[in-house]
Amino acid sequence: MRFLARLMAVVSFGFIAASAMASPTEPVEGAEYHRLQNAQPTDTGKKVEVLEFFWYNCPHCFAFEPSLTEWIKKRGDSIVFRRVPVGFRESFVPQQKLYYTLEAMNRMDIHKQVFDAIHVSRQKLDKEEAILDFIEKHGVDRKKFLDIYNSFGVQSKVGRVRQLQETYRIDGVPTVVIDGQYITSPSIVGSTMRGASEQAMNAATLQVMDALVAKKK
């Protein structure tokens, strides 16, 4: 029993020490980010790939979106940013297809409005018919949208997401992957910030992302 108690004390001390040394501007592996054992190749050349795994219905993704959008603008041409709509269950597929259809139609101006409709106006956009009604109200041709929504290209991208989720072991959102190797999120960063507000955790996450991008440049 004494040995077990000592072991637990050592483990606890190690965790506390790592948390104490961690900071958003100088993040510590295992505290504010995780490293994927097998780094994945990227096709972004000298630029750093940044993936954000998200779900439209997720309130934390909605809260993260404004500051993330500003961060993307600030980083400019130093990164290639890609959003990845997760598909943890079959019921997620309509919103995955919604995102990729908007992307294919070059109508990403509606992306924020989808978040607002769900989290501000309390609209349910998890079924095809509701999605079609929504995009039509925003000036998108219903038939053209539906053709792309059901296209092989969109279906292929949805299938690719399942592979990415498994590769990066995504089990929650929002989660960010830097250059196929470093994984962080407001949840991971927040584990070192007891009692911090969601806004503070989001801000700290962006600082961690800055540091990880700099590490890869």
Regions inferred by a protein language model and the residue ranges of each:
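Structural microenvironment flanking redox-active thiols in thiol-disulfide oxidoreductases
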Residues: 74-104, 111-136
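Solvent-exposed loop/turn segments at secondary-structure junctions
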Residues: 56-60, 87-91, 117-121, 153-154, ...
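C-terminal cap of thioredoxin/glutaredoxin-like
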Residues: 4-5, 138-217
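Extracytoplasmic thiol/disulfide redox context detector
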Residues: 2-93, 205-217
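Extracytoplasmic/secreted envelope proteins and their assembly/folding machinery
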Residues: 65-72, 95-99, 111, 128, ...
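Loop/turn elements at helix/coil->beta-strand transitions in domains of secreted/extracellular proteins
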Residues: 46-48, 77-80, 105-111, 141-142, ...
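Sec-exported extracytoplasmic/periplasmic mature domains
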Residues: 63, 69, 73-77, 103-107, ...
